Amino acid sequence: MALSVEEKAQIVTDFQQAAGDTGSPEVQVALLTANINKLQGHFKANGKDHHSRRGLIRMVNQRRKLLDYLKGKDTTRYSALIGRLGLRR
């Protein structure tokens, strides 16, 4: 259920701040969002998979922490990221 190497590379190139940037909050949030979206499809077919649901909740919490960090550091980057990813906040 993980993202393929090509999908990860595409997300990194779309959200990186500079060449070779894989650790910025934008990249990390985008990768987590892609994983979360993929897992949501998994749960439509496998509703009782509670072990994977724990991993999903952990990813959602990690994404929330990164978004809170980015919001505190730079609200314009936060707003741009939320808009690009289509998140609710």
From Swiss-Prot:
Keyword Iron belongs to the record: no
GO CC annotation, single: cytosolic small ribosomal subunit
GO molecular function term, any single one: rRNA binding
Any one Gene Ontology BP term: translation
Keywords assigned by UniProt, alphabetized: Ribonucleoprotein, Ribosomal protein, RNA-binding, rRNA-binding
Gene3D superfamilies: 6.10.250.3130, S15/NS1, RNA-binding
TM helices/strands, residue ranges: none
Function: One of the primary rRNA binding proteins, it binds directly to 16S rRNA where it helps nucleate assembly of the platform of the 30S subunit by binding and bridging several RNA helices of the 16S rRNA. Forms an intersubunit bridge (bridge B4) with the 23S rRNA of the 50S subunit in the ribosome.
Assembly and oligomerization: Part of the 30S ribosomal subunit. Forms a bridge to the 50S subunit in the 70S ribosome, contacting the 23S rRNA.
Family indicated by similarity: Belongs to the universal ribosomal protein uS15 family.
Name of this protein: Small ribosomal subunit protein uS15
Organism lineage: Bacteria, Pseudomonadati, Pseudomonadota, Gammaproteobacteria, Pseudomonadales
